[in-house]
Amino acid sequence: ISNFIENYSDFKGSISLLITGDEEGVAINGTKKVVEYLKKRKEKIDFCLVGEPTNPSKLGEMIKIGRRGSMNGRLTITGVQGHVAYPQRANNPSTALVQILKEIKDIKFDQGTKDFQATNLEITKININNTADNVIPGFATATFNIRFNNKHSSTSLKSKVNKVIKKISAKNKSKYKIEYSVSGEAFLTNPNKTTFMIQDIIKKITKIKPKLSTTGGTSDARFIRKIAPCLEFGLVGKTMHKVDEAVSLSDLKKLTLIYSNILKNYFK
């Protein structure tokens, strides 16, 4: 930005930079709060470039034009504890839990779209918390995550999953509690002249034409897209969250040049 302003100080418009340390997981006090503040101020943002590490292995491979939604579910089934020798006096919650998990895992939500992978559910935890081998537990819990495309909303998916939980719990005469947390809804920024301008700049500098993609996890674009169209492009994410996380200095220099050229072309 400083390089751009130094060379093009008479450009028409404004540039804002947002850096946050609260962008993983629930992300309460970072971009989300800033977006809420900007909405209250009725601030108009024309475009946003998010500096996520979008490239799998080489700089220039990928631009993110959207993201899948992400929703976690925590399910607790309550039965009746008892001795394994007298199952008629108990109600094993793990029976209902296993049946529910199998049925929701087997749901074919969709076949994907031209922009998104198929919606997918993964079971992430199963906990019966029973230290005795001869006791039927009183409760059992599990958590699952759904990564979903823009054919669904978190609300529609909750309804679909809840039907299965309700049906199998009733069949097994078990009580249940289901809690959901939504990290973000699926969204897509339709490619336009800005998208293709950025794609051309990246190709010119890296000699690679970047793929327009929606793969991967969530990012802060999930908040920004509520107030502005946005794309994501940054460094290579090959070592992110690993021991000895690192980036190439050569890539860093190229990325600086890419960003500088994007600003130059955007404000033409």
Residues covered by each model-derived region:
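Metal-dependent amide/peptide-bond hydrolase catalytic core
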Residues: P53-K58, I65, M71-K268
